[in-house]
Amino acid sequence: PNMRLTMSLVLGVMAVIALVGALGGAPKDANLYQTQKALDNAKHAVKKGGTIILIGACPEGLGSKTFESWLVNAPTAHSMVERIGKQFQLGGHKAAAIGMVLENAAIDLVSEMDPDFVRSIFLNPRASAQEAFSAAMEKYGQDATVIAMPFGGATLPICK
């Protein structure tokens, strides 16, 4: 059955590391266009300067042609944010949303996409969730605050 579940997660503090998944398989993690929904929720849980570890298989790559065009042709992540302010375009809005997240946090992507391609769209490729988590813990230290959001697309963190 196709159930739509939305959870609110009340946080006492914002995390330095958010481990977020687009679990549930396709279509939730079919491509980055779909997986971005989990990223958009996770941004509310991470402190400025933190890292979001985004887990989504993305076997179809990026997804939308417009989304792809915005990502691959952007000279910088911030340029997508500037562009959406001047020229709203469906598909481009999701690329700009990624650009906005990147202004506050690093994004490590665990996916099936080619690592060089992932780097070219301003994300840090990781081979596994364990590799990404270990790298983040090394960067921030063992006392880092961590939040796990396995169903990121259906979880909205609220910081109190």
What name fits each language-model region?
Residues 1, 15-28:
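Membrane-embedded hairpin module used as a gating/binding unit in multi-pass transport
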Residues 2-6:
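Membrane-interfacial loop-to-transmembrane-helix junctions in polytopic alpha-helical membrane proteins
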Residues 7-15:
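Single-pass alpha-helical transmembrane signal-anchor segments in small membrane proteins across taxa
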Residues 28-35:
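Glycine/threonine-rich flexible loop motifs
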Residues 35-160:
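C-terminal non-catalytic interaction/assembly regions of soluble proteins
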